[in-house]
Amino acid sequence: MLVASKGVLVQCDPSIKALIIQIDSSSSGIILEELDETHLLIQHDKVNFVKSELNRLLSKNIYNPFEEE
């Protein structure tokens, strides 16, 4: 029996793909299919969650010289 799922095609570089896979490992069910090294098919209702998690992860790696510690 076939099951259809709505998905969104994501094109990204391999480093961002690795981050999305990391996000999927912590909250599974986001990635429907890994197509190749630069394309993923993710659930359509998880797009905003993936964007916010990517922004959170990437903001950790930005150096701001004006930010007080």
Swiss-Prot record:
- Record's Gene3D superfamilies? TFB5-like
| InterPro entries for this protein | TFB5-like_sf, TFIIH_TTDA/Tfb5
Q: Which residues form a coiled coil?
A: none
GO cellular component terms, alphabetically, are: cytosol; transcription factor TFIIH core complex; transcription factor TFIIH holo complex
- Which UniProt keywords are listed? DNA damage, DNA repair, Nucleus, Transcription, Transcription regulation
Subcellular location per UniProt equals: Nucleus
Transcription regulation found in the keyword field: yes
GO annotation, biological process: nucleotide-excision repair, preincision complex assembly; transcription by RNA polymerase II; transcription initiation at RNA polymerase II promoter
Q: What does this protein do?
A: Component of the general transcription and DNA repair factor IIH (TFIIH) core complex, which is involved in general and transcription-coupled nucleotide excision repair (NER) of damaged DNA and, when complexed to TFIIK, in RNA transcription by RNA polymerase II. In NER, TFIIH acts by opening DNA around the lesion to allow the excision of the damaged oligonucleotide and its replacement by a new DNA fragment. In transcription, TFIIH has an essential role in transcription initiation.
| Family in the record | Belongs to the TFB5 family.
Q: How does it assemble?
A: Component of the 7-subunit TFIIH core complex composed of XPB/SSL2, XPD/RAD3, SSL1, TFB1, TFB2, TFB4 and TFB5, which is active in NER. The core complex associates with the 3-subunit CTD-kinase module TFIIK composed of CCL1, KIN28 and TFB3 to form the 10-subunit holoenzyme (holo-TFIIH) active in transcription.
Please give the name of this protein. General transcription and DNA repair factor IIH subunit TFB5
Q: Which organism is it from?
A: Candida albicans (strain SC5314 / ATCC MYA-2876) (Yeast)
- Gene for this protein? TFB5
